[in-house]
Amino acid sequence: MKDVLERFLGYIRIDTQSSEESDTVPTTKTQLEFAKKLGEELKAIGLKDVSVDENGYVMATLESNIDKKVPTIGFIAHMDTSPDLSGTNINPRIVEKYDGQDIVLNKEKNIVLKINEFPEILEYKGQDIVVTDGNTLLGADDKAGIAEIITAMEYLINHPEIKHGTIKVGFTPDEEVGKGADHFDVKKFGADLAYTLDGGGIGELECETFNAAKAKVIIEGRNVHPGSAKNKMTNAVLVANKFINMLPENEVPERTEGYEGFFHLLSVKSEVETAELNYIIRDFDRKKFEERKEQIKEVGKKINEEYNKEIVCVKVEDQYYNMKEKIDEVKYVVDIAHDAMKAIDIEPILVPIRGGTDGSRLSFMGLPTPNLFAGGHNFHGRFEFVPVLSMEKAAELVVKIAELYANR
């Protein structure tokens, strides 16, 4: 599985950042260009039925090498990197045999990956670790997943003694902006179940996600010359501040963990005449999720009542739901991944995803899809890193899962 590092380093040098602002599919042209490159690579290693559609979805098949019928499994990763930080001119560095100390990412800018802030890195002391130069994210989310899947497929092709059923491979665009499954053709993909490789540290096995929605709050103010504004002006900036303060101050990402939900204010655009607030709403419990959506709408209603006119409009849109509901119907999909990890000396860590994956949506589209570790940490930022061994073990895990399904 040594090729996984070389592949990964090649992939992250291609800028595939997705965009929240774009209405195109995919949201950036670079994703489609990357999709075409991956399609060519899949053909080159020997996969069949390789396709890259106009929306940037890549699909391919590794044909079964056994006579009996077993479930067709899929492995999926996403091609885009987060819009949260630049993915242009990524300049990775390999820290060999990490010594357990702080890592200086950028001496000129004094950007340091500190162990007191990111203590999880100490788990990888003695290993080779890929880090950034402090100017960009790394792109392990999710190009590590892509590298691991392709490396595993090539390994299976080169080792026909390892028995497996039919395997489907899929790479999606725009996962980071919540659109990864929008145009995913489940029927064309042809798998009975699948796994995304989009998780964090080694051992992570995830079959629970948030229920997720987004909310846009539009506030219409009224601007009047401040010298004659009494009883006439409605300052949308101050109304926006009132709205923000009417939501629970402790139910935010930085003050919640585990199974706790939150309201997350993503952005504020405001001036006297108009203001716009963009939130995401998250909760694992479906009932609490529905209550949160009503709660944010109720804030708008109360402000409108206070001003005795409709100055606040709250629009809420569901994004995805907790995939546990669907995965529990085919529990063996998690059990096999658990057993595969044990078989290659990885201790499974069953954790809820405080986020979402393409698998969240796909599970409700008829393709149960839990999430496996890809190996990285600190996604979406300049402190992102991935241990090389974790990527190698993820590729090995894909092979072992395929083998276990063949032996069912």
Swiss-Prot record:
CDD domains: M20_peptT. Gene3D superfamilies: 3.30.70.360, Zn peptidases. It catalyses: Release of the N-terminal residue from a tripeptide. The active site is at D80, E175. Zn(2+) 2 binds at D141, E176, H380. The keyword Flavoprotein does not apply. PROSITE patterns: ARGE_DAPE_CPG2_1, ARGE_DAPE_CPG2_2. Zn(2+) 1 binds at H78, D141, D198. It is found in: Cytoplasm. Pfam families: M20_dimer, Peptidase_M20. GO terms for cellular component: cytosol. Its cofactor is Zn(2+). Coiled coil: none annotated. Binds 2 Zn(2+) ions per subunit. The keyword DNA-binding does not apply. Keywords: Aminopeptidase, Cytoplasm, Hydrolase, Metal-binding, Metalloprotease, Protease, Zinc. GO terms for biological process: peptide catabolic process; proteolysis. It comes from the Bacteria. Cleaves the N-terminal amino acid of tripeptides. Belongs to the peptidase M20B family. This is Peptidase T. It comes from Clostridium botulinum (strain 657 / Type Ba4). The lineage of its organism: Bacteria, Bacillati, Bacillota, Clostridia, Eubacteriales.
